[in-house]
Regions:
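N-terminal segment of the mature folded domain
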Residues: 23-151, 291-293, 329-332
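A bilobed periplasmic-binding-protein/Venus flytrap-type ligand-binding module shared by bacterial periplasmic
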Residues: 117-126, 241-258, 275-279
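Extracellular/periplasmic juxtamembrane helices and adjacent flexible linkers that interface
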Residues: 251-332
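Ligand-binding pocket segment of bilobal, Venus flytrap-like solute-binding proteins
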Residues: 168-235
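Bacterial N-terminal signal peptides that target proteins for export
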Residues: 1-9
Length: 332
């Protein structure tokens, strides 16, 4: 029994020593299901930066629902960079003066180094025969999703369902609102974040389907095994983007602008793009996307700009206080 505190104190010493010998420390505030991609990315960047500059970096992560994360940054969490799954979350920080107004022009691809798609995770054998969005709104179905007010994952689910309904014969905003209302009624709860939704579905065994990022399916396979679930690609789904930005006020205060800039730029390097692909995120690099084509089925997608006039407009219409989500959820 005496060995336990000894080992623990040794771990603390190691952590303190790691921090003490670092030339700089960066904090990346990110969305909930980005844990794995940055767990792999950070050591790669540390090695690259050491070779390039001679500096040792300590890299820290903070994960949670994307909207909660940016609110934490606005409230004083000193993140050097934000890596999110909704452009309007970064716009929120820009409006607060923490991020540059033209943040989306600071990096390629509107500052989104990779993409994904919203998919359904169902039980092995697909016992409820779920094939498309219409099935998720059927009576008696249980659907696990994160909270659309607080998470990019939840918003992307909501907007994907809305867009699908609009594209149906005779589709209108009225019919889309009615359809999404039916789907939301089938959610027994709203998870706090994407990883919480996965835990609810896989460990707590709640729900008939989990709606999440395509990349999350690989994490589920690694943690729970491929034998317990199947991935269903709906007939239409959102191409999700993952915008990144420097938190200017923080990097200028800490003197870490150079390191933070390089940290984000490296996401577009061959190594950074390969890491994204290995974590089942669709890389921007065309050659790598072709190399990993077998794990990325062709799927009909739309962008939030095409269907909703951009993430900020979608937020104002659907997710601000009193928006369509609140109207639907009150009815729920």
């Amino acid at each position: 029994m005496k060995k336990i505190p000894h080992l623990f104190s040794g771990l603390l010493v190691a952590l303190v020593a790691s921090s003490a010998f670092a030339d700089a420390t960066l904090l990346n505030a990110s969305y909930d299901v980005a844990r794995d991609v940055y767990k792999d990315y950070n050591p790669m960047f540390q090695k690259y930066w050491k070779q390039k500059s001679g500096e040792s970096l300590e890299l820290k992560q903070s994960h949670g629902g994307s909207t909660k994360q940016v609110r934490a940054v606005a409230d004083g969490l000193e993140a050097d960079v934000v890596t999110m799954n909704q452009a309007n979350d970064i716009e929120f920080l820009a409006d607060k003066g923490l991020v540059a107004k033209d943040w989306a022009k600071k990096f390629p691809n509107n500052a989104s180094p990779y993409t994904s798609a919203m998919v359904f995770i169902v039980r092995k054998g697909n016992p409820k025969a779920i094939k498309d969005w219409s099935d998720l709104a059927a009576p008696g179905m249980q659907v696990i999703v994160p909270h659309p007010k607080n998470t990019g994952n939840g918003r992307n689910t909501y907007l994907s369902a809305w867009a699908w309904a609009l594209k149906q014969p005779g589709g209108s905003d009225k019919s889309a609102q009615e359809f999404v209302g039916k789907l939301l009624k089938n959610a027994p709860l709203f998870a706090a974040g994407g990883r919480d939704a996965t835990t609810t579905f896989m460990q707590r065994k709640m729900g008939d389907a989990l709606v999440t990022f395509e990349s999350e399916a690989e994490m589920i396979a690694k943690e729970f095994g491929k034998g317990d679930f199947e991935v269903i690609y709906p007939s239409l789904t959102m191409q999700t983007e993952f915008p990144v930005a420097l938190v200017d006020k923080v990097v200028d205060k800490k003197g870490t602008r150079k390191q933070a800039q390089a940290y984000l730029e490296y996401l577009w390097s061959k190594e950074g793009q390969e890491n994204a692909a290995q974590n089942y995120l669709r890389p921007r690099d065309a050659d790598l996307l072709k190399k990993y084509a077998a794990q990325f089925p062709v799927v009909k997608t739309f962008t939030v700009d095409e269907m909703f006039g951009g993430a900020t407009k979608a937020f104002l219409v659907h997710f601000k206080d009193g928006g369509t989500f609140d109207q639907i959820y009150v009815q729920k």
